[in-house]
């Protein structure tokens, strides 16, 4: 099975070390463009663009990278409860059309009550997943070309429609990650690819089996992906030394503050990440070559595969054997590590190198009539 390898655009900051200004660098458009172009040339399938108040806006960043890349796809967040599904469908179709079919979407429900309150969202965990399920139903139906009337608990639309369809049919693929039962149910019913953070293989296997069984109950099959950091070097010793350097400027106070911030979230996935290290520096290798040091201060994906190219490739193939076909990777700093992964790891894997998409001709159309419909040819009498 050929593997889809993704990279990451660090719109929330970048540098040589975690938890310090030491070794940091400005993350401006030029720098993000360098990373995107490196990923494009090296054969990555796409890039994940993060979302939230700590990040630049993912949609604007993705749009700005379209003209400077050729094949790279952009995995961009959909935010139920923050954006209406109708507006999100228009945005999604436009990004797909402008990029010639290079748009992918990642459903993000949110997990930090403090950040959500700042965005005007005051739903609890179960309510957010109710809203996300309704959002996704409407979003998908619009992209399928339906005129949608929907009267849910959280979402209400009447006569919603999309005049400009996406390039990818029936719609651009929808990704989603969540560890709670309600999250897995949403994934099983509505999404195309279920993402998990980098837990030990036995825990990942358990999640995959659960989601696969739930999807089968809906008569569906679902793909799987995993989100990991990577520290790959020419030797295993060099890789482990690089891992230790990454957290060499961390102090106990910074770790404690980070763990306190994570504790206020209601994310089951974040709780599972934190349990891998319990906020302590000792015993960070939680599974062969799987290191939890990143999660001491980074929310979300908190584990890294560490080793030389063949060793990391072996670990990746263990995950692939569980049914995972997509790997969303990152490393610090992201420009240099994009090259290291491409040069030291890719030769040891069966990497699916994306082709440059051919321009898709769009149908000629006149100006929309009354802001309501697209004019069609009228038979001449």
From Swiss-Prot:
One biological process term in Gene Ontology: alkanesulfonate catabolic process
SUPFAM superfamilies, per database record: Bacterial luciferase-like
Signal peptide coordinates: none
EC numbers: 1.14.14.5
Keywords tagged on the record: Flavoprotein, FMN, Monooxygenase, Oxidoreductase
Reaction equations catalysed: an alkanesulfonate + FMNH2 + O2 = an aldehyde + FMN + sulfite + H2O + 2 H(+)
Molecular function as annotated in GO: alkanesulfonate monooxygenase activity
Family matches, as Pfam families: Bac_luciferase
Domain of life (superkingdom): Bacteria
Subunit description: Homotetramer.
Role, per record: Catalyzes the desulfonation of aliphatic sulfonates.
Family, per entry: Belongs to the SsuD family.
Further information: FMNH(2) which is absolutely required for this enzymatic reaction, is provided by SsuE.
Record-given protein name: Alkanesulfonate monooxygenase
Species whose genome carries this gene: Shigella flexneri
Gene name per UniProt: ssuD
